[in-house]
Amino acid sequence: MQWIAIGMGAAFGACLRALLGRLNPLHAWIPLGTLGANVLGGLLIGMAMVVFMKAGQLWHPNVKLFVMTGFLGGLTTFSTFSSEVFALLNSGKVMAGLVLIAVHVLLTLTATAMGYYLTRLCF
């Protein structure tokens, strides 16, 4: 049953990531869909950390697997981010690649912290 929960969550997360991926062509070197997926995933995992820490006993263990491992794992994408950064670096756009790394890391960590602390205020 665990594998089904993870697989279903991953399918939903990947579908949302594919929809967000449609935003990628809107900016020359910042793939907005990938950035949006990672920042949204960071926000949601921060929230989920609090929910499952404070009220984890209220949820079936498969729900946590569905949300955190499945959905958020399917939504966020380190491999796509890595390939986009590599493409910039490989084409000589070193500064753009470094900026993209900084933007992803800073925004995603900030979103995770925001999700965590805002959810703690509500719980």
UniProtKB/Swiss-Prot annotation:
Q: Which reaction does it catalyse?
A: fluoride(in) = fluoride(out)
Question: Can you name a GO cellular component term?
Answer: plasma membrane
**GO terms of molecular function:** fluoride channel activity; metal ion binding
Per UniProt, activity regulation is:
Na(+) is not transported, but it plays an essential structural role and its presence is essential for fluoride channel function.
Keyword entries, A-Z:
Cell inner membrane, Cell membrane, Ion channel, Ion transport, Membrane, Metal-binding, Sodium, Transmembrane, Transmembrane helix, Transport
Q: Where does Na(+) bind?
A: 73, 76
> Where does it primarily localize?
membrane
**Chain segments annotated as transmembrane:** 1-21, 32-52, 66-86, 94-114
Location within or outside the cell? Cell inner membrane
Q: Name one GO biological process term.
A: cellular detoxification of fluoride
Q: Which Pfam families match?
A: CRCB
> How does the UniProt record describe the way this protein sits in the membrane?
Multi-pass membrane protein
What biological function has been recorded for the protein in this entry?
A: Fluoride-specific ion channel. Important for reducing fluoride concentration in the cell, thus reducing its toxicity.
The UniProt family comment states: Belongs to the fluoride channel Fluc/FEX (TC 1.A.43) family.
The protein's name: Fluoride-specific ion channel FluC
Please tell me the species this chain comes from: Psychrobacter sp. (strain PRwf-1)
